[in-house]
Amino acid sequence: MTLSREDTLQWLKNCAAVIAENRETLIELDAAIGDADHGANMDRGFQAVLKKLPEIADKDIGSIFKAVGMALVSTVGGAAGPLYGTFFLQAGALTAGKTELSLPDWSAALEAAVNGVILRGKASPGDKTMLDALLPALEALKKFAESGEGLAPALRASAEAARQGMLATIPLVARKGRASYLGERSAGHQDPGATSSYLLLKAAADTWESSSD
């Protein structure tokens, strides 16, 4: 089984929907340890992506991801814009020319995307950032890709690993970004970036389950 271009476009539409639905939650999470703009910034970015999709719907998946990355860089403020922009730009570079993605393709694209975020943000696991959701998700996906199991359970396991990573940020003391200025006071709060990352990966699992029903 593979993820088609249509699946990819639907995933991006679902990303926009889930970010809009959780806009206020992301704002509240960011208000506790940041500057309260993550929800609004992410919503603005993915609404821009949504408007862009009709123009790029006939492109290959790599070109679609690159266009998404550019849209996010130009419309999402704060640290999230460059980081999520890099995420999609790196995924786009690895999927150039493809009109469908196998599980190994998706795993490799996610790995390139996460590595791009690491290089751009210079964060490490446990720093209380989006990486604390993305890295467990990537490891889960790689295990499924190596074992040759199905795409649907792989995406669901990846989303669940991201959820657990997101929750694991609650007791952490932030070592990156505005939250790090709070020191010990940043503990006890869920990281908004890890939360938005989980939402995007959950949307991927939900999209595939809907398309394969």
Which sequence ranges carry the predicted segments?
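N-terminal loops that bind phosphate or other acidic moieties
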Residues: 1-213
